[in-house]
Amino acid sequence: MEVTMYTDGAARGNPDGPGGYGVVLHYIDKSGTLHEKELSAGYKKTTNNRMELLAVIRGLEALNRPCQVTVYSDSKYVVDAFNQNWIGGWVKRGWKKSDKKPVKNVDMWKRLLEVMQPHEVRFVWVKGHDGHPENCLLYTSDAADDK
C-alpha cells in the first residue's frame, strides 16, 4: 500500500517552550477511495526538532501493515538526515556528528529508525508555510496552544 504523509512540528520559545506536531496520512484503497487520517498532540516543554521527529514517528506508528511511504516535511533536519545520509554516519560513529559532538535527540532518532523498519520510506522536503495544501502548521499551532 502506498501512503503519503505530510508532517509538521513546532515549538514556541524554542527550546523548552510549548510545542506540538501534526500529521496527515493519505492512501487510496483498491476501489479508488481516498482515506485520510489526522494526528496531532501538544507538549508543555519541547523543541521544534523533537516535534518534527515525533510527527514522523507517530505517522509511521499509525500504519498497521508494511507500506511504501512518502513523507513530506519542511524540516531540513529530518529530511537531510536521511537524504544526505547523516544518520548513517551518526550510527557508524556511535551517535556522534562528524565534529565528534553528540547527536541531539538520539532517543527520537533511534525510535524513528525502529518504526521505519517494516516500511519503505522516502523523504521529500517542502518549503514550510508556503501555502502547501497539506501543511500541518494549523495542527501544530493548535496543539501548542492546548498546552
What spans do the regions from the language model cover?
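RNase H-like nuclease fold core
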Residues: M1-R50, L54, E61-C67
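Single conserved hydrophobic/aromatic residue that forms the stacking wall/gate
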Residues: Y139-K147
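RNase H catalytic domain
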Residues: A10-D16, I57-L137
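Small-residue (primarily alanine) positions within well-ordered alpha-helices
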Residues: A55, G59, A143-A144
